[in-house]
């Protein structure tokens, strides 16, 4: 053996003892870790037990409170149902009283109503209108209403074309705007994001008020002529009628409305100066002038040329009027109060003379307390399309035959 043999022998003899020492330390380390884990698990179990006990206590405390809240909710629901029933009964009683004791129609005799033809403006004035159709209906009552949605601002107009596609909806938001929304169907208009489904039509001149009309594929509206809004001179109180082709998106005709010193016809809708309307007979315009600032005027227009064919001074007051529409040649004026209350048709004027104002029925709008910014009659559907503080509403009308004047 060499000199290193004893050292190697010593190393081999001492090696098993070193391994045994390492294993012993490892076992002790594992035991300490397991003991720590067991202690933590015990703490978690204690905390879980404590939380479970707290939850049980909280549940036991809340159950009686929930029972009391449920009883109070049932009591409130019963009271609400009772109040709703009482309100319904009161409304029926009010409707009955209004039917039994109607307010007198707004009729004021005036020399201009019964006098001869006027000398101002185009067309004949205050002459009996000769009906071009056999339409002989008048409103019996505003039967029902349906609120479609809320779209746009407090003032605007929504309508259909009575001579165009039956489903297409036109929406003109605001009293001074130049963009109209067109919806292919009513269902598209009622969607939450309706504006994304609409096509937009921009007119070359902004409209004034909410007196626009869609009729026969054209948009008829009033605008201030150049220099008309505060410009002085003859154009100070005049308006220009525009006939806009919706398909071609071009102005096909325009005409200065033949009435001087125009004022808003409706005392409660001060942004509208000319309110255009369509019925079974054609195109009409409702307006007022300073010459008689107490009453409304009515004009029959030629939809082709925008010429004024006839004009009438009506007995319907401007005060508290908010909107109007025409059915079978008869103007119906809607009145309200400020603050807004229940709207009512309280004055009518039949251009043909068949229906006298005294015989016209006073009709209240059903269960709606608001202010109409516009009303559009659709002769094809016999419905009114209303704009009430941004809400779009449809009113169904019940008709009856006109009584012949004796």
From Swiss-Prot:
Coiled coil start-end: 22-101
Keywords, in A-Z order: Coiled coil, Developmental protein, Disulfide bond, Glycoprotein, Secreted, Signal
Residues bearing glycans: 248
Any one of the GO CC terms: extracellular space
Family note: Belongs to the OLFML3 family.
Top-level lineage group: Eukaryota
Keyword hit for Zinc: no
The keyword Disulfide bond is assigned to this record: yes
Record function comment: Secreted scaffold protein that plays an essential role in dorsoventral patterning during early development. Stabilizes axial formation by restricting chordin (CHRD) activity on the dorsal side. Acts by facilitating the association between the tolloid proteases and their substrate chordin (CHRD), leading to enhance chordin (CHRD) degradation. May have matrix-related function involved in placental and embryonic development, or play a similar role in other physiological processes.
Cysteine pairs bridged by disulfides in the record: 135-328
Record-annotated Olfactomedin-like domain positions: 134-401
Protein name from the UniProt record: Olfactomedin-like protein 3
Pfam families: OLF
Native source species: Rattus norvegicus
InterPro entries: Olfac-like_dom, Olfactomedin-like_domain
GO biological process, one term: signal transduction
